């Protein structure tokens, strides 16, 4: 058995990158992931703090709905969600305009990353309910004395959140950010539904086996050669897909480990 190859080559890596349109798909992925993660972080940080510290009417009901979003799979409501973004009426404004003009003002957001931005900002991004729950658990374990001292010094709720809570939640913010990046990066279902021409890297990786059927016309390799290289190409496709995530994790590992320990999640 030969453990190390005698002749090293990057052909499989090049074929995987070509078949996946790596440059275009990685740009599309970044355009989707970065703004979505930032918007989602803003929403879940505020919502988690609100559920942990403020008592208001309907709080229990809203938290129950939050848990409901964690349990219910997106496949159960994808049809109305797709229909909403196909004929987006700007949260009812387009329908209101239609009462006076006779024609509803709608726009299709399909094949645009703004679909993910809106969901992230409105608290319905990928796994937003889980992140709110995690942050709620963290904030509930935070000493009340610091917030009380800030209020005595004249800080309102928002200033207390910005000056006291956020600086002490760095590890949890990084943890939630990592979770969010990974889930958006690896998402196939929503990406394949809302994108129709240019796809992110998760869709390209899933379709790599099919794309390899056409690689012989692109790269000049014979179909028989590609058959023998298939497993190596698929492995290289997985490698170049997860490589950016691995690099990110290397730099954020310390915060991630600390955040998991302080999140209040056990089991």
What are the functions of these language-model segments?
Residues 1-267:
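A structural signal for multi-pass alpha-helical bundles of membrane permease subunits
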């Amino acid at each position: 058995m030969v453990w190390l190859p005698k002749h090293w080559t990057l052909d499989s890596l090049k074929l995987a990158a070509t078949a996946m349109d790596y440059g275009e798909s990685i740009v599309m992925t970044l355009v989707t992931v970065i703004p979505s993660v930032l918007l989602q972080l803003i929403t879940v940080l505020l919502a988690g703090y609100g559920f942990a510290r403020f008592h208001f009417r309907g709080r229990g009901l809203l938290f129950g709905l939050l848990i409901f979003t964690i349990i219910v799979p997106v496949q159960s409501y994808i049809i109305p969600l797709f229909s909403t973004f196909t004929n987006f009426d700007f949260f009812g404004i387009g329908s209101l305009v239609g009462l006076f003009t006779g024609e509803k003002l709608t726009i299709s957001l399909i094949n645009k990353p703004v679909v993910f931005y809106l969901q992230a900002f409105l608290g319905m991004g990928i796994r937003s309910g889980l992140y709110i729950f995690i942050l709620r658990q963290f904030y509930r374990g935070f000493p009340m004395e610091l917030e009380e001292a800030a209020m005595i010094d004249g800080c309102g709720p928002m200033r207390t959140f910005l000056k006291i809570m956020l600086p002490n939640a760095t590890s949890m913010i990084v943890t939630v950010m990592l979770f969010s990046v990974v889930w958006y990066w690896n998402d196939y279902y929503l990406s394949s539904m809302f994108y129709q021409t240019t796809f992110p890297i998760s869709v390209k990786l899933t379709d790599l086996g099919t794309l390899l059927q056409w690689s012989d016309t692109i790269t000049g390799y014979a179909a028989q050669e590609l058959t023998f290289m298939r497993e190596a190409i698929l492995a290289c496709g997985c490698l170049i897909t997860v490589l950016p995530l691995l690099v990110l994790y290397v730099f954020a590992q310390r915060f991630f480990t600390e955040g998991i320990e302080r999140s209040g999640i056990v089991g």
